[in-house]
């Protein structure tokens, strides 16, 4: 069977969870689903192969990186566990990212704690992507698509019995001497299930495949880095979850408490590093398989405490008493004063409360009606304690009592007629944002009159404090997806949608045009500084896509799939260079240097094509099954108002894999090919990168209760610049835009990691 059949899909939706309707087995039997290399859980979606998920656990500690296997999906470089996913050139908050049904939020001006950073790859059981045109039931407050990640469902024992099992794993990587482990345990009866999962990941700095800089100093006396070492790529992370679930007949109640402790994580493309991130997440869900369909309800709460400062590879002491701006190493000084600064602490606290209720109602035949409501209330405080020198004598309030409240409702009709499947939906959404008054380092009260302060802090604060900051956006989204199974060897799909996203708090309510402060508000990793505009309009994307899928009748020998797409975004949030002195758009653009930009709505267009193919080469009992697979994509993004290119668009890329499966063995050789990134954002002074090719090896052996794998990434230790890695600011005097001989200066992209040998083992008990 090549793909999920319609009756099986309905049965799976109604069963909702393993064993959910055990008391009525005659109506809800076990459903076994098989599919091809990109499993399709529903129309418009692509799912990561569970085997691929398992094979990534020793290779990466970054859940977002697991999605690189899908055509059209890439990742912005960030910290070692915090990459930002991108779908067809739209990334980060332009995507809806759900983790176990929760819309988690990054509480950081650099988005160092994005949603996928709260789940370890070792805890991921399933993951799927809805690119571009998404059904309204899974889309919302996004324009680029939806990513859905789930941990394993609760498990129950047969009636009258108990179940006790678990698994443990460990891995090591030569890159950064990274290592980690994971543990999971379950105890269950027929009605109750108790579970625990935990993981730990740690790494030192990684190295490139060659020297990429001509300096070794870090800004810290006595501490230097080799010219091939990528500064600020270290990390340490611990994630733990405790779960209790109860079922009775067709009803399931599931509660999970998760805790994350991330004591340090370096960021090579950000001027700050994460020095502490703790999060408590409470997730309570109900699922009922009822006579008329499925009812689901969920409430969750996320409480985040986040801290940043200059990490081990970046200058910590600033001010004249530390040696001044021209010193490559800041000397310790005291006392903290107008001439002596100890770091630049930045803190943010975020609270995120969500509620959702949705139902899938059976209609005639296999047709379904999905309806639902969602509420999300988010609160954010972001402030920077005084630390001396220019950060003195009071705290800097970046966002005060930021509020972003979402209210949404949707209806979606899924219709099946012979070889046709159609999903038509409408979604109504209202998003209210607001923030309180602010002040800079130069005063302890929010000013409403006056000027002054270094970097025009008082002037900018007055303009912000006297503005109308209470904004409400109400809009209607729609999507229509049609699939036609023309024959046993041809499938076609067409989709059209209008999707809307309200600006985030850091886009609307950051206020200071001062270069130093703006440098700290950046979640794209380009080394520039950004500040917001309270009058930003929501982004609206009108997208059209089509898919042609040709394959053999059995779906096991060959396939070719092409998906062209086009998106018009009339209110795309891009940026313009800003002159802080005159508080106007820059009359003369800054070229080949870092600069300050302000968010601005502008007309944009994105288009491209995703492609994939596979071919079964031969199958032998003695030699195994050999398969060749090709995936890739091409994307372009243009700012139609300025004729500039959009930032961080992945260039033409393709991955060619030759794999062998024999018994418990899976072996693969992978070629990764990326074209030159020549089309870059001039307003941001984005750096071009050259094309490259890499070779990776993987071997995995799996038995019922244990598995072991080894692999080599970048086999030939090839040097290359990561096209979405951003600007290298991983060491030196990163708080400022320094003059020679100081660093970091504009012109060095973050390089990719050199050769990395890894090994992992997993045991079940």
Residue positions per predicted region:
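Membrane-embedded beta-barrel scaffold of Gram-negative outer-membrane proteins
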Residues: 294-310, 485, 491-493, 497, ...
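Solvent-exposed loop segments that connect transmembrane elements
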Residues: 208-230, 309-345, 383-397, 433-470, ...
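C-terminal beta-signal and adjacent terminal beta-strands/loops
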Residues: 204, 209, 500-501, 575, ...
């Amino acid at each position: 069977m090549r793909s999920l059949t319609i009756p099986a899909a309905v049965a799976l939706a109604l069963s909702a969870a393993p064993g959910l309707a055990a008391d009525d087995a005659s109506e809800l039997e076990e459903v076994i689903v098989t599919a091809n290399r990109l499993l399709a859980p529903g129309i418009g979606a692509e799912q990561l192969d569970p085997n691929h998920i398992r094979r990534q656990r020793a290779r990466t500690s970054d859940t977002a990186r697991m999605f690189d296997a899908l055509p059209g999906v890439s990742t912005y470089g960030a910290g070692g566990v915090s990459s930002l996913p991108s779908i067809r050139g739209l990334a980060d908050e332009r995507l809806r990212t759900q983790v176990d049904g929760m819309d988690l939020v990054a509480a950081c001006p650099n988005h160092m704690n994005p949603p996928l950073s709260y789940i370890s790859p070792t805890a991921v059981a399933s993951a799927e992507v809805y690119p571009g045109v998404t059904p309204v039931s899974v889309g919302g407050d996004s324009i680029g698509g939806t990513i859905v990640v789930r941990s394993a469902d609760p498990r129950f024992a047969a009636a009258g019995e108990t179940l006790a099992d678990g698994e443990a794993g460990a891995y090591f990587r030569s890159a950064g001497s990274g290592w980690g482990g994971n543990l999971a345990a379950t105890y269950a009866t027929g009605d109750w299930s108790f579970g625990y999962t935990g993981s730990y990941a740690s790494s030192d700095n990684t190295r490139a495949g060659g020297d990429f800089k001509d300096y070794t100093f870090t800004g810290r006396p006595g501490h230097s880095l080799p010219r091939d070492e990528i500064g600020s790529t270290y990390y340490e992370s611990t994630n733990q979850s405790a779960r209790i679930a109860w079922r009775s007949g067709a009803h399931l109640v599931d509660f999970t408490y998760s805790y994350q402790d991330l004591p340090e994580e370096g960021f090579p493309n950000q001027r700050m590093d994460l020095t502490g991130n703790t999060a408590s997440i409470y997730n309570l869900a109900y699922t009922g398989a009822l006579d008329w369909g499925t009812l689901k309800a969920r409430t969750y709460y996320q409480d985040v405490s986040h801290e940043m400062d200059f990490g081990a590879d970046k200058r910590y002491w600033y001010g004249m008493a530390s040696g001044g701006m021209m010193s490559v190493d800041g000397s310790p000084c005291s006392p903290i004063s107008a001439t002596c600064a100890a770091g630049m602490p930045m803190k943010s606290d975020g609270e995120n409360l969500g509620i959702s209720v949705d139902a899938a109602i059976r209609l005639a035949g296999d047709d379904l009606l999905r309806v639902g409501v969602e509420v999300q209330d988010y609160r954010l405080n972001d402030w920077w304690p005084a630390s001396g020198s220019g950060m003195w004598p009071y705290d800097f309030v970046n966002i005060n009592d930021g509020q972003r409240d979402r209210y949404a409702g949707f209806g979606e009709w899924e219709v099946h007629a012979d070889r046709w499947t159609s999903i038509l939906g409408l979604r109504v959404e209202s998003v209210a944002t607001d923030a309180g008054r602010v002040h800079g380092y130069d005063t302890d009260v929010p000013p409403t009159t006056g000027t002054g302060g270094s970097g025009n802090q008082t002037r900018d604060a007055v303009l912000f404090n006297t503005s109308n900051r209470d904004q409400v956006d109400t809009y209607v989204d729609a999507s229509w997806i049609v699939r036609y199974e023309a024959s046993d060897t041809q499938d076609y799909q067409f989709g059209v949608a209008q999707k809307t996203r309200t600006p985030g708090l850091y886009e609307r309510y950051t206020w200071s045009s001062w270069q130093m402060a703006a440098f700290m508000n950046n979640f794209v990793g380009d080394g520039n500084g950004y500040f917001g505009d309270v009058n930003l309009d929501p982004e609206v994307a009108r997208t059209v896509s089509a898919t042609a899928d040709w394959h053999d009748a059995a779906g096991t020998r060959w396939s070719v799939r092409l998906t062209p797409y086009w998106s018009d975004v009339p209110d795309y949030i891009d940026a313009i260079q800003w002159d802080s002195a005159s508080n106007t758009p820059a009359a003369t653009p800054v070229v080949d240097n870092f600069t300050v930009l302000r968010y601005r709505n502008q007309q944009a267009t994105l288009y491209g094509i995703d492609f994939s193919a596979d071919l079964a080469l031969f199958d032998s009992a003695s030699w195994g099954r050999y398969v060749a697979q090709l995936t890739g994509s091409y994307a372009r993004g243009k700012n139609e108002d300025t004729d500039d290119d959009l930032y961080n668009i992945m260039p033409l890329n393709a991955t060619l894999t030759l794999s062998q499966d024999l018994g418990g063995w899976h072996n693969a050789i992978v070629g990764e090919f990326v074209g030159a990134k020549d089309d870059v954002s001039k307003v941001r002074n984005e750096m071009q990168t050259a094309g490259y090719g890499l070779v990776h090896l993987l071997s995995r052996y799996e038995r019922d209760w244990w598995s072991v794998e080894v692999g080599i990434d970048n086999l030939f230790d090839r040097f290359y610049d990561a096209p979405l890695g951003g600007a290298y600011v991983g060491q030196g005097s990163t708080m400022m835009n320094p003059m020679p001989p100081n660093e970091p200066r504009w012109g060095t992209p973050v390089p990719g990691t050199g050769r990395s040998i890894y090994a992992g083992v997993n045991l079940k008990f």
